[in-house]
Amino acid sequence: MSKAKQALYLIVSLLVIIADQLLKNYIVTNFKIGDEKTIIPGVLSFTYLQNDGAAWNIFSGQMILFYLISIAAIAVVIYYLFNPKYKNGLFDTGLALVLGGIIGNFIDRLHLKYVIDMLQLDFIQFNIFNIADSAITVGIILVFIYLIFISEKD
């Protein structure tokens, strides 16, 4: 992979981190825990929560475990992102999104000992999440699309 493409994928990761941290800072500055504000009626609200667990608050309070998993996941994603054997735009974009999401939540865990969540979908019963979580989810979907439908053709 050329250095320009490597830089592009790192920029994608960086944009995820910046957007995630800026929205989290906005929420912390303007909301109290539990406060809710409708953004798009019937679609999206901001609800400020502090999550000291993982998805659905599993493993609540297990910070050492989250640190180790985050560091290992970052290492694995970087390995695949920069390994010339695994090169595909969809795959690499997915990995860049996952990397940005992992780092975005890792920053919270290191600094605050919890993750700030705020995005609530009002049209479906779903947990409150953040931009980093969204990037990880979309990134994993892109990686799976590549692995299931494209990788055999490469």
UniProtKB/Swiss-Prot annotation:
Subcellular location: Cell membrane
Membrane topology term: Multi-pass membrane protein
EC number(s) recorded for this UniProt protein: 3.4.23.36
Presence of keyword Cell membrane: yes
Active-site positions on this chain: D117, D133
Entry's Gene Ontology BP terms: proteolysis
Molecular function terms from GO: aspartic-type endopeptidase activity
Keywords in alphabetical order: Aspartyl protease, Cell membrane, Hydrolase, Membrane, Protease, Transmembrane, Transmembrane helix
Ranges annotated as spanning the membrane: 8-28, 58-78, 88-108, 131-151
Catalytic activity annotation: Release of signal peptides from bacterial membrane prolipoproteins. Hydrolyzes -Xaa-Yaa-Zaa-|-(S,diacylglyceryl)Cys-, in which Xaa is hydrophobic (preferably Leu), and Yaa (Ala or Ser) and Zaa (Gly or Ala) have small, neutral side chains
Pathway field: Protein modification; lipoprotein biosynthesis (signal peptide cleavage)
Entries under InterPro entries matching the protein: Peptidase_A8 (IPR001872)
Chief location of this protein within or outside the cell: membrane
GO annotation, cellular component aspect: plasma membrane
Pfam families: Peptidase_A8 (PF01252)
HAMAP family, sorted: LspA
Family membership: Belongs to the peptidase A8 family.
Function, as annotated: This protein specifically catalyzes the removal of signal peptides from prolipoproteins.
Name of protein: Lipoprotein signal peptidase
